[in-house]
């Protein structure tokens, strides 16, 4: 059943899209000889190569951990990875819907609108990934015990070590797969990913024998950091990220505030259920309040949208 559900989820959307093609393509007048398949082959080959590299890259740490150490540590590591990826999915949800828009603006040479959308997207990524990263560091014990049970306590530190990848992958995903890809700079994404894969492999070779799944977590965090840095440097000519814009500085200020708040709550209540519940609720309230005080564009837009929905 699991295999059937997985396959259906993967290909189901494509099957429905095939039937919807009839609204856009006239199959009665369709002729194969009119297709210029070769002009699509090279871009598709780059995507194929990138997917292969990413597939090897994301599974390398788990394979090496099981080969060098044992399956028990793989289980601890896998638990931390799964929760981290679930949290990361919240941030990455925006990227999927933005790629067609980026591609359209780039193809029509609307570079001013392209840059404005890119700046806004990067700011959104930073504004969402930073508090999630901090939350994952503080809430790792509660999350591991909630979803995996007390037997997976060794997964807690691994999850905390890997928490920075939420920020790194979110930025590199938006910059690489959306912005640079839309600009036709797929090679930069491929080079960056290859460098990350090599660094990950080398670090795993040195760290896993001594530190086990913690070493794998360190290797993954450093590798993802290097992917992001290399991508930013190589792509700077085509798009430069303004990390210290007024909007982004607001996110740093708000994130620093919730760090102090969580440290205070942790000292007051200890690491338990009360800290978990109060920490999440108060962090969300404080974070949004600071953004509202600083007149953050996303909060203002959300407020306007809610008012319009209520009074509509």
What do the predicted segments below correspond to?
Residues 25, 176-184, 232-246:
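Alpha-helical transmembrane segments
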Residues 1-23, 43, 194-199, 213-234, ...:
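Hydrophobic alpha-helical transmembrane segments
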């Amino acid at each position: 059943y699991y295999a059937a559900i997985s396959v259906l989820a993967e290909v189901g959307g494509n099957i429905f899209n095939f039937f919807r093609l009839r609204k856009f393509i006239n199959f009665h007048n369709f002729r194969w000889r009119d297709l210029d398949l070769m002009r699509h082959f090279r871009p598709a080959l780059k995507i194929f190569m990138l997917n292969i590299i990413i597939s090897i890259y994301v599974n390398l740490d788990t394979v090496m951990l099981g080969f060098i150490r044992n399956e028990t540590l793989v289980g601890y590591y896998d638990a931390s990875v799964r929760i981290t990826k679930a949290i990361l999915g919240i941030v990455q949800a925006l990227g999927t819907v933005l790629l067609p828009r980026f591609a359209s603006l780039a193809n029509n040479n609307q570079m001013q609108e392209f840059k404005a959308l890119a700046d806004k997207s990067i700011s959104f990524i930073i504004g969402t990934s930073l508090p999630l990263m901090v939350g994952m560091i503080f809430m790792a014990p509660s999350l591991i015990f909630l979803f995996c049970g007390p037997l997976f306590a060794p997964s807690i530190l691994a999850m905390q070590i890997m928490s920075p990848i939420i920020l790194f992958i979110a930025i590199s995903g938006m910059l690489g797969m959306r912005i640079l890809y839309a600009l036709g700079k797929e090679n930069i994404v491929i080079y960056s990913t290859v460098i990350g894969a090599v660094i990950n492999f080398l670090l795993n070779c040195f760290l896993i024998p001594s530190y086990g799944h913690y070493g794998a977590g360190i290797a993954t965090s450093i590798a993802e950091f290097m992917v992001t840095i290399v991508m930013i440097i190589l792509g700077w000519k085509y798009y430069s990220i303004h990390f210290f814009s007024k909007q982004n500085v607001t996110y740093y200020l708000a994130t620093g505030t919730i760090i102090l708040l969580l440290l205070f709550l942790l000292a007051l209540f200890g690491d338990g259920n009360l800290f978990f519940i109060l920490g999440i609720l108060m962090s969300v309230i404080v974070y949004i309040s600071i953004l509202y005080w600083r007149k953050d564009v996303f909060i203002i837009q959300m407020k306007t949208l809610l008012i319009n929905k209520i009074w509509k």
